[in-house]
Amino acid sequence: GRERWLRLAATGDVAWQRAQPLLRSPVRQRLRIRISELPAGVTLRAGESALAALTDLADPAEPEYAVASRLWPKQDAPRTIPTPDTGTCVVELWRYAPEATADRGCVDPLSLNLSMGEVMDERVQLAVQSLMENISW
């Protein structure tokens, strides 16, 4: 097969910083549902669950998963739950298929960084910073 290579004028981390104003979170919507109603194909960890798998952050009380919004059932979708409860999980509906760039059962680190941008929890922000420092550009 053929391969295509992209060469950046700057190092990866510098290019990432310069691109920040042009980027947005891949998360279109966040839904809370009963974990027992989670569709079978939705297994990719996202949000704090992915951050916990990739850093020293503790697992969240509610597991978080990602799926492309176009794959989420429009009819017969699981009923949403308004507040956290025992046996619930969070499903992030993404603008694109997160599986395309996923690694080790988690969304990719750059997309994870973008999806966590509005979280104000200091321990989460420290974990995101640690994640970004460990990327080999």
Which residues does each PLM region occupy?
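Short, cationic-aromatic polyanion-contact patches
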Residues: R2-L23
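Long, low-complexity, charge-rich intrinsically disordered regions
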Residues: Q17-W137
